[in-house]
């Protein structure tokens, strides 16, 4: 099972920058992650949630979406649809950090948009790997798992998701 990645950023240039970083990362992790939606409007994300019901998704959200709702409100909707979601805010507004605790959003992390590109990229990659690690740990603790390694990568699958091994 690939982990779905959903992006929501109203600024097209910022969205493309985020997509580039994640796409480069996925080149080496394509069996684990997949960008399933890249949106500029929160309503697109909400429609996707209602139609496809993703589970254990990784969500990159701009806090200050210039739309009918902001990133915090969108995160609350995501949390209702995908309880185990890993929510990462990409923002220039570090003053919103306490609000995420107040709203009980359980954000996995915050990435500053206005930092050096290499640092920006490094944070995103670290958060993707952390999201994978936490989702895998939750799976293993809940179910029987089939675990194997190829090179330096370890793969974990729910035993119920396996139909056949060759």
Name the predicted role of every residue range.
Residues 1-4:
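Non-catalytic signal-transmission and effector/linker regions of two-component phosphorelay proteins
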Residues 9-10:
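Conserved acidic carboxylate
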Residues 16-20, 35-58:
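Acidic, metal-coordinating helix/loop segments flanking the phosphotransfer/catalytic sites
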Residues 28-35:
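Short mixed-charge
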Residues 33, 55-136:
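CheY-like receiver
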Residues 122-166:
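Conserved binding/recognition cores within well-folded domains
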